[in-house]
Amino acid sequence: LIKDNGNIEIRAEIRTQFGSIIKVVEVSTNSEKVSLIYNFPKWDKVFGSVRLGVMTLLNQFSHKNTKILCSNGGRDNEIFNFSGEFNHTKPPSTLVSSSRGLGATTGKIQIRNNGKSVNLQWDPSESAVMPMLHNESFNNRTLSRVIFSMREMDDTLKKPVNIEAFNFSISTF
């Protein structure tokens, strides 16, 4: 579908046992930007974790000089080395689905490597997501990912919760 602004929109319905997920990908024809939208129409309340928007980084962003920049509540961005092995998505126990992630309180993450950057952006007032990182090496290659968590669970979760829509953009500026 070509939108009025000239952008290209691709829409798909993904049927799951919990209900349909409507995924929309919009590619800008004016800038280096792709937007993704996830909607969960008619979903019942969910008791568990929900992770989506998995971004797998190319190997050129998996080197030791890759940096992650985001704000974790302060005025300025914090800078993290995206090196070594770690997996924020790994549950620490059977009662807790995750023990770590990024605050990214401004709804922005920048991934930098050798003068190149990828920017992820969302509106935290619309979607309270927690970005998680995964970096793992095997056979002289590295798997590097950013994953968004909409829900995590622990032993204090008593009631199921609604799943809201989530949208974010990927850009190079």
Regions found by a protein language model. Name each.
Residues 1-24, 28-52, 89-173:
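Beta-strand-rich recognition/accessory modules
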